[in-house]
């Protein structure tokens, strides 16, 4: 028997794949230039072609609040179950949240 690997990107075969039309290494420039202010709600949307500043797969699709900035990356507060987590994510993996946030 072969031992099961437990790397950082395990179980991401479908999660970290792009649509055929979206393939390519370079993200849109507008995506990289997007600025977020403290208190903004954002969705963590992992871009698999950019490995820098990529959060763990468990945070994909979660809504968080911008707490601040660290270099080019943002400090995001995310609720995971009953705990609050603080993660550092680059803007390539963030999108503005357009829905209504209760709370």
Curated annotation (Swiss-Prot):
Q: Does the keyword Ribosomal protein apply?
A: yes
Superkingdom of origin:
Archaea
Instruction: Please list which residues make up the signal peptide.
Output: none
- What GO cellular component is one of the record's annotations? ribonucleoprotein complex
Task: Enumerate the HAMAP family for this protein.
Answer: Ribosomal_eL21
Q: Which family does it belong to?
A: Belongs to the eukaryotic ribosomal protein eL21 family.
Q: Entry's NCBIfam families?
A: PRK04306.1 (NF003303)
Q: What is this protein called?
A: Large ribosomal subunit protein eL21
Q: Which organism is it from?
A: Sulfurisphaera tokodaii (strain DSM 16993 / JCM 10545 / NBRC 100140 / 7)
């Amino acid at each position: 028997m072969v031992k099961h690997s437990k790397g950082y990107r395990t179980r991401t075969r479908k999660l970290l794949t792009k649509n055929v039309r979206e393939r390519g290494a370079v993200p849109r420039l507008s995506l990289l230039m997007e600025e977020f202010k403290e208190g903004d709600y954002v969705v963590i949307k992992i871009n698999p072609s950019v490995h820098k500043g990529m959060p763990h797969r468990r945070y994909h699709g979660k809504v968080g609040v911008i707490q601040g900035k660290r270099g080019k990356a943002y400090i995001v507060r995310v609720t995971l179950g009953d705990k609050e987590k603080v993660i550092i994510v680059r803007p390539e993996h963030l999108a503005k949240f357009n829905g209504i946030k209760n709370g």
